[in-house]
């Protein structure tokens, strides 16, 4: 919906938002009319190599059928020295908190969502996809395997979310 794109644009950067979902792009265009949106498959981006200073995906990589391929495509379209950033649900580091969180995600979230949402199944998918997603070190390894340099992450909200970044190497 362009939420992270809007924040980046407010910081003074030129932004081109893309999404696979026409519905998400329509909502994004409504919410962020000043940002251009392009329909794109994350695993086959319609941009030339080395086109952007950065590529950012927020809460979307987990939903791509081939997330490693999408991450590779993000790196491909970023100029050497540029940044690839992924903001995604992750794994709380504190063991007790992780246990409580996992029980909430798999137990309560789908149940509560089915009571208040017309699409309760989406919340079951959300819970399952979060728990199946690699932890912080696992996603960091993906960055390194793709050749991104200085791959690192920062936990947000106790590790419920992690912000990963890596840099495209200079040739």
Regions picked out by a protein language model, each given a short descriptive name:
Residues 1-45:
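Class I SAM-dependent methyltransferase SAM/SAH-binding core
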Residues 3-4, 87-146, 152:
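C-terminal alpha-helical "lid/dimerization" subdomain adjacent to the S-adenosyl-L-methionine
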Residues 8, 73-74, 166:
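Class I S-adenosylmethionine-dependent transferase superfamily signal
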Residues 15, 84-85, 150:
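A short hydrophobic/small-residue beta-strand
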Residues 43-54:
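A short acidic, Gly/Pro-enriched loop at the edge of an enzyme's catalytic core
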Residues 53-67, 90:
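A short SAM/SAH-binding and catalytic strip from SAM-dependent methyltransferases
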Residues 68-83:
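A short glycine-rich, Lys/Arg-flanked "PGG" loop and its adjoining helix->strand segment in the class I
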Residues 140, 146-171:
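Core SAM-dependent methyltransferase catalytic element
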């Amino acid at each position: 919906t362009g939420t992270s794109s809007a924040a980046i644009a407010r910081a003074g950067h030129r932004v081109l938002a893309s999404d696979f979902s026409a519905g998400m792009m329509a909502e994004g265009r409504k919410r962020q009319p000043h940002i251009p949106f392009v329909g794109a498959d994350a695993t086959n981006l319609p941009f030339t190599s080395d086109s952007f200073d950065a590529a950012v995906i927020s809460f979307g990589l987990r939903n791509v059928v081939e997330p490693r391929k999408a991450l590779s495509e993000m790196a491909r379209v970023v100029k050497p020295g540029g940044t690839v950033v992924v903001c995604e649900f992750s794994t709380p580091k504190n063991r007790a908190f992780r246990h409580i969180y996992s029980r909430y995600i798999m137990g309560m979230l789908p149940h509560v969502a089915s009571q208040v949402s017309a699409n309760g199944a989406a919340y079951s998918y959300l819970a399952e996809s979060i728990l199946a997603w690699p932890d912080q070190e696992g996603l960091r390894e993906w960055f390194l395997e793709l050749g991104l340099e200085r791959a690192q992450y920062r936990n947000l909200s106790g590790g419920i979310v992690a912000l990963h970044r890596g840099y495209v190497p200079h040739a």
